[in-house]
Amino acid sequence: MTNENYTGVTTGTIATACSLAALESILDTSDIDCVKVKTPKKTLDIIIDECKRLSHSSACAVAHKNPYNDPDVTVGLAIVATVELLDKTSDGDSVIITGGEGVGKITKPGLQIPVGEYAINPVPRRMIRKNLERILPEDKVAKVTISIPEGRKIAKKTMNPKLGIVGGISVIGTTGIARSMSSEAYKNSIVTQIDVALALNLDNLVFVPGNIGEKLALKQLDITKQHIIQTGNYVGFMFEEAKKRGIDEFTFFGHIGKLIKIAGGIFNTKHAIADGRREIMITHAGICGADTKTLQKLYDSKTTEDMLDILDEENLHLDVCNSIALAIKERCMQRFDLDLNVILVDMEGNYLNDNFERFLL
């Protein structure tokens, strides 16, 4: 892998390595502390922390997803594969893959795996199958069970519960290699929310920036959690994906401190990429008649909430927030051809604009 500090391996690669090590230990009694795993990108050497035979025809292996430069909740997790070697009695699959403790189960449609199956995604399944078939005797079947002892606990920190994946985390990966701060991996996880909502035939979807927006939306709107789509910082990406899937209109709900960036054409709201909140607020305050003294106060403010207090003092709060909401709506129509119902709120969930449709209230 290039630039080792910035790449790691996926849970799918570790699961494959453990499966391969367990099978090798059944076929060869020598100690196994490293295996070569063929991924869609390249062959990787994966260290095995423990491997032991359970019987003449079964074994288990454990490996950890080693740290790399990424805030990944699965880093450091132990992944276990138990392999049982059976006599082949039919022309069916030679490698049977299932899940154990800590691997989630699919309970809702719209995902890559059918309802009722363990959340071991297609690429990891193929990796396990292809790597094991290289050394599997033709007259045998390998039954592989993947377990993640801490998976149930870690799952609470992921989007799995929202997506209907219960009881643990998912075994994922598309290339076998995890890249530092990989926007692709994160995007792949959040866009799944749209697929699940569409599979459930839900109308009146509500897009929010994150957990705070979701909490406030559930408090203020007549909707369920399933209607809510979190965009994270990737607002533009999520809107593009919604449009690709035939969604033309929805509600965009959230704290003005996040949503105001969209009024300025900033569709990735990560602070390090762009801010502009103060400048956008000042522009709309000026449009709505704020004098120079008020504009200077806004410029000197540290937070969006402080700016709202200043607008309140000048009785400009509603006009400015309506202007910002309209700008957000216009930006999204121009960029994505989306008709948004924009609702701006403060940290308490109080509505800041009133130029929105009220069908969800």
From Swiss-Prot:
Reaction(s) catalysed (UniProt annotation): Co-precorrin-5B + S-adenosyl-L-methionine = Co-precorrin-6A + S-adenosyl-L-homocysteine
Pfam families per the UniProt record, alphabetical: CbiD
UniProt pathway annotation: Cofactor biosynthesis; adenosylcobalamin biosynthesis; cob(II)yrinate a,c-diamide from sirohydrochlorin (anaerobic route): step 6/10
KW Methyltransferase (keyword) present: yes
Entry keyword annotation includes Glycoprotein: no
Alphabetical UniProt keywords: Cobalamin biosynthesis, Methyltransferase, S-adenosyl-L-methionine, Transferase
EC number: 2.1.1.195
UniProt record, GO biological process: anaerobic cobalamin biosynthetic process; methylation
Family annotation (NCBIfam families): cbiD
HAMAP family: CbiD
Recorded family membership: Belongs to the CbiD family.
The name this protein goes by in its record: Cobalt-precorrin-5B C(1)-methyltransferase
Species of origin: Methanobrevibacter smithii (strain ATCC 35061 / DSM 861 / OCM 144 / PS)
